[in-house]
């Protein structure tokens, strides 16, 4: 198996670590290659998330594909880009990762806001061989609600920076995946939160319906049927709907060329069912080997 560890230089001059594993058609994956450990892992489990999800995805694909993995979300939290995380710069960063890996053409997989990044990549570049969007609707995406959530989060981060937050409940107080948003405190810095406000502000004029005509590569979207999040007033008082637009527009999406998968009963944080969907679809689309 071919292996390499690289660095890609991003739009602000910072670098992100890139792990390359396997051989075959190239798949860019915005996932964390390193399993999360310690208290952070327990926090992820509290939210119903596998701390080793990225690693498991890489290992599950590397015997049939050339996987290019990079923890972009972790990077922007370590190296915030409060004024420059625009859609254009985001796409430029993804292309910089592909360039560092020597990938002229490649498939892309992203989950949640990094799936939305993949849609921007597909619209702004002709280098995609396939697009996989997990937990973000290709049509009727929650751009306005997410701006309100990110703006509220930024306000909370600014307030938290000037005064200590109230004690948080113990990690075991809520069942996995059932977090009470009224008790959650912001632990991010103002710079970390402002970058997402910058991103969603720039996306307010984005017409995802018009964008469909610009998509030429094979594409798959999947959501959990329970992926609906209602935030209380502290977080903007909005409902971020991920599953409903996909279910509601399923026939239209399929007519537009999307393969659509709805995972019954799963919510936004439960991404462990990705591999059984992702690998067969990539193999049939790109020609990578099956297990």
Regions from the PLM with identified roles:
Residues 48-77:
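Conserved alpha/beta-hydrolase
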Residues 88-106:
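Conserved acidic catalytic loop of the alpha/beta-hydrolase fold
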Residues 225-262:
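Conserved loop-alpha-helix segment in the C-terminal half of the alpha/beta-hydrolase fold
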Residues 247, 254-291:
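Catalytic active-site module of serine/aspartate enzymes centered on a nucleophile-bearing elbow/loop
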Residues 25-42:
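Short beta-strand element of the alpha/beta-hydrolase
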Residues 116-123, 127, 131-160:
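Flexible "cap/lid" loop of the alpha/beta hydrolase fold
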Residues 138, 193-211, 243-247:
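Active-site nucleophile elbow and catalytic-triad environment of alpha/beta-hydrolase enzymes
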Residues 215, 221-223:
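Short beta-strand/loop motif that positions the catalytic acidic residue
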């Amino acid at each position: 198996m071919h292996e390499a560890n690289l660095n890609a230089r991003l739009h602000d001059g910072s670098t992100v670590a890139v792990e390359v594993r396997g051989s075959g058609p190239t798949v860019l994956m915005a996932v964390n290659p390193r399993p999360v450990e310690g208290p952070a892992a327990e926090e992820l489990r509290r939210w119903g998330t596998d701390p080793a999800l990225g690693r498991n995805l890489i290992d599950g694909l590397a015997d049939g594909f050339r996987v290019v993995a990079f923890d972009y979300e972790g990077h922007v939290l370590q190296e915030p880009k409060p004024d420059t995380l625009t859609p254009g710069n985001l796409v430029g960063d993804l292309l910089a990762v592909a360039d560092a890996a020597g990938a002229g053409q490649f498939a892309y997989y992203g989950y949640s806001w990094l799936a939305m990044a993949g849609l921007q990549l597909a619209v702004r570049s002709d280098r995609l061989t396939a697009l996989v969007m997990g937990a973000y609707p290709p049509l009727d995406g929650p751009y306005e609600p997410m701006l309100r959530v990110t703006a509220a989060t930024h306000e909370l981060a600014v307030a938290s920076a000037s005064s200590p937050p109230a004690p948080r409940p113990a990690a075991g107080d809520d069942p996995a995946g059932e977090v009470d948003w009224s008790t959650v405190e912001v632990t991010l810095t103002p710079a970390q939160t402002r970058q997402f406000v910058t991103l969603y502000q720039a996306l307010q004029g984005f017409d995802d319906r018009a964008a469909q005509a610009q998509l030429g590569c094979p594409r798959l979207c999947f959501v959990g049927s329970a992926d609906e999040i209602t935030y209380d007033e502290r977080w903007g008082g909005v409902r971020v709907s991920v599953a409903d637009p996909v279910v509601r527009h399923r026939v239209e999406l399929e007519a537009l060329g999307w393969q659509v998968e709805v995972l019954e009963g799963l919510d936004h944080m439960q991404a462990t069912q990705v591999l059984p969907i992702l690998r067969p679809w990539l193999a049939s689309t790109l020609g990578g080997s099956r297990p």
